[in-house]
Amino acid sequence: MSPQTETKAGVGFKAGVKEYKLTYYTPEYETKDTDILAAFRVTPQPGVPPEERGAAVAAESSTGTWTTVWTDGLTSLDRYKGRCYHIEPVPGEEEQFIAYVAYPLDLFEEGSVTNMFTSIVGNVFGFKALRALRLEDLRIPVAYVKTFQGPPHGIQVERDKLNKYGRPLLGCTIKPKLGLSAKNYGRAVYECLRGGLDFTKDDENVNSQPFMRWRDRFLFCAEAIYKSQAETGEIKGHYLNATAGTCEEMIKRAVFARELGVPIVMHDYLTGGFTANTSLSHYCRDNGLLLHIHRAMHAVIDRQKNHGMHFRVLAKALRMSGGDHVHSGTVVGKLEGERDITLGFVDLLRDDYIEKDRSRGVYFTQDWVSLPGVLPVASRGIHVWHMPALTEIFGDDSVLQFGGGTLGHPWGNAPGAVANRVALEACVKARNEGRDLAVEGGEIIREACKWSP
């Protein structure tokens, strides 16, 4: 061993276990514009000081391990370590606190959501010194944002492609989600689109099953799109789910969709994975396809209030990885959602610059610079009587995605789609005339019923 690499016991190195807070708790640290900042909700084991547990989170999600190692002396820990720089109690929760951690940007590969999450949440959530841990928010610095392509096209480009302005877009998920033949599936798509919807959608678990192979579904849906476009004079689309068992197969399906000339494909970004999603997003940008994102499996990650990851973090990650639409909850439908919190991450999806606002769950000011925005998709358990609230809450830059609220119409799919479109246009017209949708919404819908099925 050369003199330059030889390490002797007792010379600059002392083996053994020491408290994390001695190295990783730095309340005097001033965060840098280039740091990735994280807010963790920590529930420690009894008797452990918050400073030690906050420092443990910073250590185990960056450079630390359970003991001092001699290779620590071969690098600069002060340059690369995560730092717990602030701790605050959670109101109403005696055993929880928020630990703020700063990570140097050099810890992360450029343009890789996969690497970012592997570092920040990949290991520390199984740490036995913690009873529970939840990542509430991330601040992504501009320097890191600029390494991502982001959404394939964004809100304005999508509107230009569709030639549709001044209102939310309307969609419908085809039901039953499983069991239809490709031909019957295409018929259902056609009926919805000719009735007035902008989009129809594959359900998240429609891939390529024995009862309906993907290529057959793509062909019959493309036929439905072109036929409904010819009848209505509007541009239509169907979210063709390209999610597959391999990235190669996924791209093959997207290529076929492009060859058919349809405007949009779909991906289940959590079950498919961020690497696959980013690859598909790049393909869609290069080939003029819009990309609809479904968040299947999100509740496994974000449902618990004290463990896992809040959806606002997944929403930020999706904007970085790439998608033109993403499901965001409804506030008024059958799934969980708090209005202010939901609107907080809706703003994080759509806006260029979002100020810190703890009442809306936004822990950090976020600057997206030139990264395109993502349309939030309100879906699950909604129907025409929710239209006034949805129009008021989500505004024009959104997709209102019905299912049973269209297909459950007693006269069939096309009349259900007509009812959706009439209700939406009535609400938009009333809003533009200055009427209060929150107060007069029911009356507006009743008036619209006079000229709608």
From Swiss-Prot:
GO terms assigned for molecular function: magnesium ion binding; monooxygenase activity; ribulose-bisphosphate carboxylase activity
Propeptide positions: 1-2
Cofactor: Mg(2+)
GO BP terms: photorespiration; reductive pentose-phosphate cycle
Modification after translation: The disulfide bond which can form in the large chain dimeric partners within the hexadecamer appears to be associated with oxidative stress and protein turnover.
GO annotations of cellular component type: chloroplast
Catalytic activity: 2 (2R)-3-phosphoglycerate + 2 H(+) = D-ribulose 1,5-bisphosphate + CO2 + H2O; D-ribulose 1,5-bisphosphate + O2 = 2-phosphoglycolate + (2R)-3-phosphoglycerate + 2 H(+)
EC numbers, comma separated: 4.1.1.39
Free-text remark on how the cofactor is bound: Binds 1 Mg(2+) ion per subunit.
Active site: K175 (proton acceptor), H294 (proton acceptor)
Miscellaneous comment text of the record: The basic functional RuBisCO is composed of a large chain homodimer in a 'head-to-tail' conformation. In form I RuBisCO this homodimer is arranged in a barrel-like tetramer with the small subunits forming a tetrameric 'cap' on each end of the 'barrel'.
Its job: RuBisCO catalyzes two reactions: the carboxylation of D-ribulose 1,5-bisphosphate, the primary event in carbon dioxide fixation, as well as the oxidative fragmentation of the pentose substrate in the photorespiration process. Both reactions occur simultaneously and in competition at the same active site.
Name by which UniProt lists this protein: Ribulose bisphosphate carboxylase large chain
Organism: Galium album
Lineage of source species: Eukaryota, Viridiplantae, Streptophyta, Embryophyta, Tracheophyta
Gene, per the UniProt record: rbcL
